[in-house]
Amino acid sequence: HAYHLQQAVERSEARAAVVVLSSNFVQRGEPALQDKWSRAETALRCGADLVLELPVPFSCHNAGVFAKGAVGILASTGVVTHLSFGMEGEIPEMDAILDILLHEPLPFKEKLKSVLALGMSYVEARANAIDALLQGVKDALSTPNNNLALAYLLEVRKRRAPLEITPVIR
């Protein structure tokens, strides 16, 4: 995370870095390895200027809800101009993917419904449904970092949040 913070500040030319961290509980309701105070202190030592807590109802949920909370917090400050997150690699089709998820065309809905009926997880089924429309993107949508990146981008678009996107490739 220190590398990510350094890269985000460098790429955005930010004068200050605001970090949103999960509470004491993380995805699936599991306790964090370190308490929120220790993690906030570490973030400050690594260069963050302000650390804000992502409340438990967001931090324990899926990527979409997690992103909704984080983007909401950052956008509501009125001072944050950039959003940085990690990705596993560039996804050239990202705008087309976001358009599909925002507008949910009928072929997407039908494919999603059919693959969910096979017992796939929602994330896997969504990747398959998008891949049916934009062949070759399923693998890129199957990694946790890219899934969260997609959730952040989708939330920024839904809110029309004035945040410039600064991804860091891991």
Q: Can you name each region flagged by the protein language model?
A:
Residues 41-55:
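A glycine-rich helix N-cap at a beta->alpha junction
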Residues 53-170:
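Active-site cores that bind ATP or allylic diphosphates and position pyrophosphate for catalysis
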Residues 9-10, 44, 71, 75-76:
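Non-catalytic positions within long, well-ordered alpha-helices that form the structural scaffold/packing
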Residues 1-39:
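N-terminal catalytic cores of NTP/NDP-binding nucleotidyl/phosphoryl-transfer enzymes
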Residues 38-41, 106-107:
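Acidic, Ser/Thr-rich peripheral helices and adjacent loops at domain boundaries
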Residues 22, 37, 45, 60-61, ...:
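Trp/Phe/Arg-rich N-terminal binding region typifying the photolyase-homology
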